[in-house]
Design a protein with these regions (language model features):
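C-terminal structural segments of small proteins and small subunits
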Residues: 90-115, 120-121
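N-terminal beta-loop-helix "entrance" segment that forms/cooperates
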Residues: 46-60
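Short internal beta-strands
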Residues: 38-44, 80-84
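Short, glycine-rich nucleotide/cofactor-binding loops
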Residues: 9-22, 54
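A glycine-rich helix N-cap at a beta->alpha junction
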Residues: 57-84
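Anion (oxyanion) recognition and catalysis
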Residues: 32, 74, 113-114
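Histidine-anchored nucleotide/phosphate-binding helix
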Residues: 21-36, 40
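Short, flexible loop segments at the rims of nucleotide/cofactor-binding pockets, characterized by
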Residues: 56-61, 96-100
Length: 122
């Protein structure tokens, strides 16, 4: 069983056009710094973030550029999942997405939540 204080699941629905996408990854990275194992599940417009070049120009001062936040998240071992139906609805395939993204259903987060993971939604 997962220790509830050690796992965090962040569910994102906002894309590159909304500041909450940058806020979510800032908080996810902060969770990792605090010692949490963090997973981000992208759904709806958030799936567009991880399309290659999908977040190149998204900067919300004073936060780091979104592309840097996501790269840091992945480099530090964060798990990044893109909702299967949302990816398919947009006509994307795995090779359309940045490296490190896994196309997955919501069962990935349900397993963690059932085991006691904390959740945040943006």
């Amino acid at each position: 069983m997962v220790e509830s204080a050690r796992e965090l699941v962040v569910v994102m629905t906002h894309g590159a056009d909304h500041e909450l996408s940058s806020v979510a990854f800032t908080i996810a990275n902060g969770g990792m710094t605090a010692g949490l194992k963090v997973s981000v599940f992208l759904t709806s417009a958030a799936v567009d973030l991880v399309r290659k070049k999908g977040m190149e120009h998204t900067v919300v001062p004073p936060l780091e550029p979104l592309a840097s936040l996501v790269a840091d998240f992945l480099k530090r071992g964060g798990r990044l999942w893109a909702c299967t139906p949302c990816v398919k609805a947009r006509g994307y395939e795995q090779n359309d997405l940045i490296a490190g993204v896994e196309i997955a259903g919501s069962s990935k987060i349900h397993e963690l939540i059932k085991a006691g993971a904390a959740t945040l939604s943006f």
